[in-house]
Amino acid sequence: MQGLYRRFRVLVLHPMAEKGNKMFKKILTATDLVTVCDASVLTAAQIAKQNNAKLQILHVLESASAVDRHLIKHFITGKDIVTSSDYEETVREEINKVYIEVLKPSVNYEIRVTPGFPWEEILRWTREEGTDLIVLGPHSARAEEKGVVRVVGKIGSTVEGVIMHENCPVLIVNSSIQKEILKFKRILVSIDFSKSCECALYFAVKLAQKYDSKLFSFHMIPVPPIPKYSKTEYEADTVMAKKRLKEFCHEFLSETDHEYIVWGGALPHLEILKCAEKKDVDLIAMGSHTKEEAGRWYAGSVVERVSFRSKCAVVVVTDPEVLLTWQDSLTEKIKTEKYMDRSIRVFTKK
């Protein structure tokens, strides 16, 4: 388990507290709403209250140009304007009006308004401040208004960009979550024996120790769609899988109330959601694996589909060894390459 300290940045820079103390010191959330509340901000605020943490609220101005990110749409009139410090302060004040009654006096918070690409600005602020947790919605709250087509089973480009470039845990919420559920008393960890999954498990254990929770380790056996796969074979595979699951998890779970769950299925995301509902969990923890398809990197279909459909919060952790590099160069590249269509984001290993 010592090797995990070298891989998991958030645990190296910000060691997790013992039970009863603060789990998080700095929590970042992002919203594209100005005049109404966003579920991700309300959820982040509740977690900040529980941990006496600083809350960082980010709003990235909607751009009217793929070339110049300072050319934006006015949040009231919708007209194209060039942003300025005065305009950004006006937007910040409007956002503050929406949340001031919810946040004060119990939450120490900061609101930042800036032009740019949302996922890049999230990464920038996260790394400037050493953020412990990022809270996001699976899609833009204004996706339909912006003309963005939501693909069933897919998370938005902002969440995807953050997950692929940052191993700070990302909490994905589909709606505002009740305060009681945010105590994270029943946590499900999806286990596929990967390094990212190991990071997610370690993070989930620290949460369980903080909140005195029960942790469920779940593994799905892929069931081949052939008639020759007998009940005897399935039972033997189940025994072997549970043994492997215990060997993988036991070092992490020795001081945590836990249960091992193994069953067969064809689609991992459906079985994870089924297990979450059956065990009435209030958090699903997953490891993310960046993948490449036709020149484009993405976060992994199981993570996407679970995050998109889950009724409870989903926390995603990515192994640092599979993160894509980001050196804050993409924005400048797009400014200079005016022919580039920003709706197609191509990443390389360089």
Task: Name what the model sees in each region.
Residues 2-5, 14:
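Low-complexity, intrinsically disordered or signal/transmembrane-proximal segments
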Residues 9-15, 20-22, 46, 50, ...:
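Gly/Ser-rich helix-loop-strand patches that form or flank binding pockets
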Residues 17-77, 106, 185-235, 250-254, ...:
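Small/aliphatic-rich secondary-structure junction motif
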Residues 36, 142-144, 196, 268, ...:
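Short glycine-rich, flexible loops that bind phosphorylated cofactors or substrates
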Residues 40, 68, 146-147, 183, ...:
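Short, well-ordered secondary-structure micro-motifs
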Residues 77-93, 233-242:
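A short acidic, glycine-rich active-site loop
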Residues 109-111, 258-261:
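Rossmann-fold cofactor-recognition segment
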Residues 113-122, 263-271:
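Charged docking surfaces used in two-component/phosphorelay signaling
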